Amino acid sequence: MRGVVLMSKLTSPVFEYVIPEGLPPGGTFTQNLEMVADTTAEYAPFNVLTVDNFSTKTVKVLYGAGHFVRLRGNSMVEIAQNGIRSFSVVNSDSEATDGIIVAYVQKRVTAEIALEAIARKIPVERLMGGE
């Protein structure tokens, strides 16, 4: 009897997470993108994380395996990296956030990913973190 091989999807819709204002100093918002009860699980892992900080406070965005960026107030960052399975936003300021913070995740096949898969002669699914 052959085993069943489950493959994650190559592309996904954009999933949006709104972090309300008032995240206390040192407070953390964490989103696990592989929760079975959530529709994001069938698309995980993701390869694009965009965070739009509408607050005037500085936050730290953690993603992947120990990677992070600091994001000043009223600014945005787009992170493109394979294997994003969760992310956290930490208020690294001394005061609570005074505006919302919006995070978007998506899985998409970029030209770079397609070219790398061709050059390395490996399936795009494997390169993007699928099994």
PLM regions and their residue ranges:
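Hydrophobic loop/turn residues within beta-sheet-rich immunoglobulin-like superfamily modules
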Residues: F54, Q81-N82, S92
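Short, solvent-exposed S/T- and G/P-enriched segments that are highly enriched in secreted/extracellular
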Residues: S12-I19, L23-T39, G64-A80
